[in-house]
Amino acid sequence: MAINVIINGINGKIGRVVKENITAQSDLELVSGTGRQDDLAKTIQTTHADVVIDFTTPQSVFHNAEIIIQSGARPVIGTTGLTLEQIALLDKQCRNKKLGAIVAPNFSVGAVLMMKYAKEAAHYFPDVEIIEMHHSQKIDAPSGTAIKTAQMIGEMRSSKKDEPFKDRARGEIKNGIPIHSIRLPGLFSHQSVIFGSNGETLTIRHDGMDRNCTMPGIFMACRKVMELDYLVYGLENLL
């Protein structure tokens, strides 16, 4: 039986790409698409949606996720902006409802592997900085992927305070790691994690060329979320 899917944010840039690609997935049925003016809860109920893919805005994503869970569907969220406290609250709601949810700062499998390898490298290289580069329309900085990468690396290191540099050009500190953000036309989605040690450096880099790079991860999440009864944060936890 096919999984009934709603795309929330269907008129957005990535929502349109998901719509174009989902028809090729024989086990996923697009039953509706919603936007800012639509009643999401009512749409979930009338379409009997199993999964809602959310690519909306940082301002609305937490409210959207609560609506999805309370309406009995499973959120697959690619919208950035959720805090760790909000993610914990959503996980509690999922467990109460026995519903799965997936929140991923990046649905690109390549980007997730980059984060995974960076975490492994942190065993051997204590000094690291992150450079993330995106198109000029990207709203948030640092990116959700960069913040998640810093969190994963931070798990392998002794605790470091997020004390800001006196010189702001040295970047914003997350989990004790400097992050540098670049926003320019001509870029899409790029991140380098640069480790340094005596006499050597190690760079782990991912380049996303367009939004199609996220499609395999999004559709994998739609399938995996049906097997869960709690929230999973990060696509790396599904690989």
Swiss-Prot record:
GO terms for biological process: diaminopimelate biosynthetic process; lysine biosynthetic process via diaminopimelate. Its EC number is 1.17.1.8. (S)-2,3,4,5-tetrahydrodipicolinate binds at residues 135, 144-145. CDD domains: DHDPR_N. It catalyses: (S)-2,3,4,5-tetrahydrodipicolinate + NAD(+) + H2O = (2S,4S)-4-hydroxy-2,3,4,5-tetrahydrodipicolinate + NADH + H(+); (S)-2,3,4,5-tetrahydrodipicolinate + NADP(+) + H2O = (2S,4S)-4-hydroxy-2,3,4,5-tetrahydrodipicolinate + NADPH + H(+). Keywords: Amino-acid biosynthesis, Cytoplasm, Diaminopimelate biosynthesis, Lysine biosynthesis, NAD, NADP, Oxidoreductase. Gene3D superfamilies: Dihydrodipicolinate Reductase, domain 2, NAD(P)-binding Rossmann-like Domain. Pfam families: DapB_C, DapB_N. NAD(+) binds at residues 9-14, 78-80, 104-107. One of its GO terms (cellular component) is cytosol. It is found in: Cytoplasm. Pathway: Amino-acid biosynthesis; L-lysine biosynthesis via DAP pathway; (S)-tetrahydrodipicolinate from L-aspartate: step 4/4. Belongs to the DapB family. Catalyzes the conversion of 4-hydroxy-tetrahydrodipicolinate (HTPA) to tetrahydrodipicolinate. This is 4-hydroxy-tetrahydrodipicolinate reductase.
